[in-house]
Amino acid sequence: MTCVGIDIEQFVRDPYGSGIQRVLQQLALQWPVDGPGADFVVPLDDAFGLLTPEQAAGLLSLAFVPRDPGADLRHIVRDHLVALDPTRVRAGDLLSIYDAWLLPEVSYLPSVLERFELFAKCMPTAMIGYDVLPMSDPANYRFKPGTAAWVSEYFRHLATADAVVCISDYARDGILGRLRRDPALPISVAHPGGDHIEVQEGRPPARPLFTRLGTMEARKRPLEILAAFLEARRTQGLEADLLFIGAPSASDEEINEPARRASASDPAVRWVQGASDDEVRELVGRSSAFLSIGTEGYGIPVLEAVRLGTPVLFDGIQPAGDLMSGHGARRIDGLGHHGLVSAFEAYGEA
């Protein structure tokens, strides 16, 4: 029987509950019992641990469950991995175990990319394609010194892997266009779903609440959202609240500081970090509107908000928003400052 090795070292090294890591979690949870065999492969001490899909699902889900404030998720993941006591093999044995190799997460780790290069010489390789934004919009990304060459190496593999499955048409078009992937090589689109959340009725509060979910990244326009909200309150008398849910930018403190300052000084602005799945669902489900503005490779939170019964207001490159337009999501004039101010005013009175 065919057996696939799935490399999840990136998750173990940097677990942070992103949309990409949600895809990994669902990949493990939904791996077909009648499909090819699969091991989720992780470095473990001086060997590699081989996790079953069930074991991997439990490990990957740790990024989305409640934990004590200040707890180091990397340590939690490491302790859980050791407790699983998975089958261990030497690095040299991996090549003889697998018939194909899958890299399911964006990774600029030299160890991950060098391993992919080695396996590509011996067997079919596949990747999940999320976007090419670091190549098409480099101004939005600040990589640590010495990382640039590995960023390029990751995208080189995305252009040459034997097969790529993309999360959206936008991702596929970027890989074919920007990366110039040979269109004769297999490349397909499989949209992530939102059915990990049960359909619910929305529970909006009496005072309008606008919620934005995701890491503070320039491409998602958190500062533009904040500036428009504050102006709508100041000039239009908007009586509403704004909630940010998500981690701070790891590379751009200039994005974090204004949001941190506003949440500390203005009771109408809140910023919740480190929220679990249950906490996110409660907060989004009790919002008046969910904001998704800017550029997304796909936008799983849009699907989650729709299933929680919370109307979605979106603008920009939003594949999931476009899919759900007219079905719980609405495109607004949200890329310009004045349009976003007007949207806050209009929907704050609804």
PLM ranges: what are they?
Residues 1-350:
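Carbohydrate transferase catalytic cores enriched for Leloir-type hexosyltransferases
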